[in-house]
A protein has these predicted regions:
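Active-site metal-coordination/substrate-binding segment of hydrolases
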Residues: 1-68, 89, 291
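Histidine-centered active-site/metal-ligand motif
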Residues: 7, 61-62, 124, 275-279
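Midchain, well-structured core segments that form catalytic/ion-binding scaffolds
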Residues: 8-10, 16-35, 71-206, 210-221
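Catalytic-loop motifs flanking and including active-site residues across diverse enzymes
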Residues: 39-46, 135-138, 231, 256, ...
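Buried hydrophobic packing segments
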Residues: 44-54, 82, 139-143, 260, ...
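Phosphate-handling active-site elements
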Residues: 52-65, 146-155, 303
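Active-site-adjacent substrate-binding region
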Residues: 137-152, 194, 220-268
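Zn-dependent metallopeptidase/amidohydrolase metal-coordination segment
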Residues: 168, 174-176, 244-303
Length: 304
């Protein structure tokens, strides 16, 4: 028994999607102004095509579960709230990854999002600046103490956003907000980096007289599937039968597979053939997409 999964949502698309058929390269591509949405409409097409092939055939197959999530692009939020007790399958195949058909994702990181809301005190910058508490200055000092960039082969961090101030230069800024993230495929390093993001807060509050509202939100946890595990071997045998060359990779972002694995369902990611997702240059190779439907069906026929 297996679950076939994909997500229904896509990133912001400027209110339109205009697919273009590129006959020379045998692809569907975006129009250069917005996304194609192959991430992850191609995953949905793959699953539906697999079901079509299975129902049209008299080949025996095990039970099949289909899981279409929402809010994946917003931080893998939708599948976080699946009722995993309702799933009977202990294997899941998530058709959501960039790359040619044959790419299998065996690992993805944990991710935590951090928010700092820094409260200072406003004052007139010309008449009585000494009565103000500058939130920007405190935020800058805080940022300099936060981990940033690659921390190790397993862990990355990023200070992504700061909001502060107004267009008026005569006001001491009383509020600033910082957004940051951390990712890691190592559980110990993930816990350590979470502590590093929290560590400077008290010192900054005391030194600059601000108050800081701090929130850390672990969005999903890492997983790693070994190549010899059954969930992988089934996919590899199906690929071999279809003449697909497998490529086993780790992914740098989260996916619905993170939550499946967290709840004891062995899950891997499979690429349906799209590239440059989330950009106006997104495209998908049509032959890869068709083959991926065949692959999903072959996997379903192989899982008893």
């Amino acid at each position: 028994m297996a679950s076939l999964a994909a997500h229904l949502d896509r990133v912001k698309n400027n209110e339109k999607i205009n697919p273009i058929y590129d006959e020379e390269n045998k692809t569907f591509k975006a129009d250069g102004e917005t996304i194609l949405a192959a991430d992850d409409v191609s995953g949905i097409c793959t699953v539906l095509d697999a079901l079509r092939r299975i129902t049209a055939s008299d080949k025996p197959h095990g039970d099949i579960e289909v899981a279409f999530s929402v809010c994946e692009e917003a931080g893998v939020l939708g599948s976080k709230y699946f009722d995993f007790n309702a799933f009977k399958a202990r294997k899941a195949y998530v058709f959501d990854a960039p790359g040619h058909i044959g790419r299998i994702i065996l690992q993805a990181p944990s991710k935590c999002k951090f928010t700092y809301k820094i409260h200072g005190k406003s004052a007139h910058a010309g008449n009585e600046p000494e009565k103000g508490i500058n939130a920007i200055k405190a935020a800058s000092a805080l940022i300099m103490q936060l981990p940033d960039n690659r921390q190790s082969p397993y862990t990355t961090t990023n200070i992504s956003t700061i909001h502060a101030g107004t267009n008026s230069t005569n006001v001491v800024c009383d509020y600033a907000e910082i957004l940051a993230e951390a990712r890691s495929t190592n559980d110990k390093e993930f816990e350590e980096v979470l502590q590093k993001f929290a560590a400077p807060i008290k010192e900054i509050e005391e030194k600059y007289g601000v108050t800081i509202e701090y929130n850390e939100n672990v969005m999903y946890y890492t997983f790693k599937i070994e190549p010899e595990e059954e969930v992988v071997q089934i996919a590899l045998k199906a690929m071999n039968k279809l003449g697909i060359e497998p490529v086993l990779n780790a992914g740098g972002g989260g996916m619905d597979g993170n939550h499946f694995n967290r709840h004891g369902i062995k899950a891997i990611g499979i690429a349906p053939g799209y590239f440059k997702n989330h950009t106006p240059n997104e495209h998908i190779f049509i032959e890869d997409l068709i083959t991926c439907g065949k692959l999903a069906a072959e996997i379903a026929w192989s899982v008893k």
